[in-house]
Amino acid sequence: MLKLLKVSITGDLSSGKTEACQVFQELGAYVVSADEISHSFLIPHTRIGRRVIDLLGSDVVVDGAFDAQAIAAKVFYNSVLLQGLEAILHPEVCRIIEEQYHQSIQDGNYPLFVAEVPLLYEIHYAKWFDSVILVMANEDIRRERFMKKTGRSSEDFDQRCSRFLNVEEKLAQADVVVENNGTKKELHQKIEEYFYALKGAL
């Protein structure tokens, strides 16, 4: 079977991971998102959905669908519930990422397979990938981006960031570090350079 290079994009909250993935997609890569995958199978009447309800309670379901804000309100200030939710979701996310990888090979039209996995190191999934890109930005810039995009508070930013591994540990493990303290155009140029470097190495 043809082997397609597996690349993961990771980084802290509001560092620019999704923007980087969009550039890869525009350049022809097969791109998947761990967050989008987890949202796609969070359906109340599925096996995974029932496990989530058993953990968090039926009040996280509103009008027949999971309420993201209700889930967040329960887990972000309760580490036991958060760990329980992640134990349910993360294995399924990894399984689907790997299914998508094999699908991308079967399709045969892609130069790279790219997965956005925010908690890549936290769930010990980095070794599955051939290369890891760590997207970084200064904390004050990330905080401003987060608050502007979500309308949430600075305290929410801090609480969500507490889930992430220390940045020094990530720096020690990443294959490539992309700084994203500037404009979108500058980020696009950096990702394009890495895309063509990877293609050239194949």
Swiss-Prot record:
NCBIfam families: dephospho-CoA kinase. Belongs to the CoaE family. ATP binds at residues 14-19. This is Dephospho-CoA kinase. PROSITE patterns: DPCK. InterPro entries: Depp_CoAkinase (IPR001977), P-loop_NTPase (IPR027417). One of its GO terms (cellular component) is cytoplasm. It is found in: Cytoplasm. Its EC number is 2.7.1.24. It comes from Chlamydia pneumoniae. Pathway: Cofactor biosynthesis; coenzyme A biosynthesis; CoA from (R)-pantothenate: step 5/5. One of its GO terms (biological process) is coenzyme A biosynthetic process. The lineage of its organism: Bacteria, Pseudomonadati, Chlamydiota, Chlamydiia, Chlamydiales. It is an enzyme of class 2 (transferase). It comes from the Bacteria. Residues 6-202 form the DPCK domain.
